[in-house]
């Protein structure tokens, strides 16, 4: 709470949240948020590896690659895509978007690592990157929850009301190879898109604390 309050004060978005005394040194605060930004960068990098690995092996010149992100399970969240729009948001709202994306992708990544690792489409490279992403997503999620604990319930409520639920498992294990490949491509493409948003929101939180936005 102390950290999120300091950040909120810096952008003048929540004056009533500002305590009179901050217990955490600015240097420590800066280190924590820079580490969060590094985590989000790593998530993008591993997601990019997963996407390109599958794309090069299975998806070249395939019709299902067209408009694949139009049916991502997170589309109804309407998360901001433009940096300019995200920069106009206060830090509490940014933290909500971060948690919404992290929560929404936990199940598909978990199933990819635990239940789908024997699928031929899940190469060692993809599996290794997926495992790294699971670890880093859980670490980033824990950090955001600690600093912005007040948004956890509103985020869960929003996800519930928007009916954000990934239901692609049946297609991923389909006996029809075209159906299976289309589902894997959509999974990796949607994750790639959302990881870039996640990275942008986290980077904005970090650059605000270092005054480098």
Curated annotation (Swiss-Prot):
InterPro entries tied to this protein: 4_helix_cytokine-like_core, Somatotropin/Prolactin, Somatotropin_CS
A GO CC term attached to the entry: extracellular space
PROSITE patterns reported for this sequence: SOMATOTROPIN_1, SOMATOTROPIN_2
GO terms of molecular function: hormone activity; prolactin receptor binding
Record's keyword annotation contains Signal: yes
Disulfide bond entries: 72-190, 207-213
Annotated compartments: Secreted
Glycosylated residues (UniProt): 45, 67
UniProt keyword terms in alphabetical order: Disulfide bond, Glycoprotein, Hormone, Secreted, Signal
SUPFAM superfamilies assigned to the protein according to its UniProt record, in alphabetical order: 4-helical cytokines
GO biological-process terms attached to the record: cell surface receptor signaling pathway; female pregnancy; mammary gland development; positive regulation of biosynthetic process; positive regulation of lactation; positive regulation of receptor signaling pathway via JAK-STAT; response to nutrient levels
Signal peptide: 1-13
PANTHER family: PROLACTIN, SOMATOTROPIN,PROLACTIN
Function: Placental prolactin-related proteins may play a specific role during gestation.
Family designation: Belongs to the somatotropin/prolactin family.
Protein name listed in UniProt: Placental prolactin-related protein 3
